[in-house]
Amino acid sequence: MELGELLYNKSEYIETASGNKVSRQSVLCGSQNIVLNGKTIVMNDCIIRGDLANVRVGRHCVVKSRSVIRPPFKKFSKGVAFFPLHIGDHVFIEEDCVVNAAQIGSYVHVGKNCVIGRRCVLKDCCKILDNTVLPPETVVPPFTVFSGCPGLFSGELPECTQELMIDVTKSYYQKFLPLTRI
């Protein structure tokens, strides 16, 4: 199925020199600690918490509406420590997600309304289905599908997952166009 054009109002997004498109309705706390490596889309009502620890997002990533990206923490006897969050290239995070992972590899798809628990590790080329809740410190192996509450293994992905995710994220970016007056 071919993706149609996704038009947005140019005044509602900030476009950086490296091609990132960030909604003015999103909240980036501690923006000096947030690195978007290029051609990444952050849609309206998203929250990225760079004030807690560094957040690095790779190239050609999409973070859809109302998602929260927050670095993981660990409780110690003397308090709480936050750790950096690394997200790879060509990662697609759907609407209404809460991501509290330690690491998300490249070529990963996170479905709608998911909760990625504290300090989870999502390896390259994996998929989390809609409405999945991953418990804290879950490791999702490459080429697997996780679903349910709690999130458990439910299937495998083909070897071409990397190419498919590159295709999806690049075409989404190319079709995400400013609305021009006719």
From Swiss-Prot:
| Domain of life of the native organism | Eukaryota
Query: Where does it live in the cell?
Result: Cytoplasm, Cytoskeleton; Chromosome, Centromere, Kinetochore
Q: What InterPro entries does the record point to?
A: DCTN5, Trimer_LpxA-like_sf
Residues bearing N-acetylmethionine are 1
Question: Keyword Aminoacyl-tRNA synthetase, does the record have it?
Answer: no
Record's GO cellular component, any one? dynactin complex
Q: What function does the entry list?
A: Part of the dynactin complex that activates the molecular motor dynein for ultra-processive transport along microtubules.
Subunit relationships: Subunit of dynactin, a multiprotein complex part of a tripartite complex with dynein and a adapter, such as BICDL1, BICD2 or HOOK3. The dynactin complex is built around ACTR1A/ACTB filament and consists of an actin-related filament composed of a shoulder domain, a pointed end and a barbed end. Its length is defined by its flexible shoulder domain. The soulder is composed of 2 DCTN1 subunits, 4 DCTN2 and 2 DCTN3. The 4 DCNT2 (via N-terminus) bind the ACTR1A filament and act as molecular rulers to determine the length. The pointed end is important for binding dynein-dynactin cargo adapters.
Family according to the record: Belongs to the dynactin subunits 5/6 family. Dynactin subunit 5 subfamily.
> Which protein is depicted?
Dynactin subunit 5
Q: Which species does the entry assign this protein to?
A: Pongo abelii (Sumatran orangutan)
> Gene behind this chain?
DCTN5
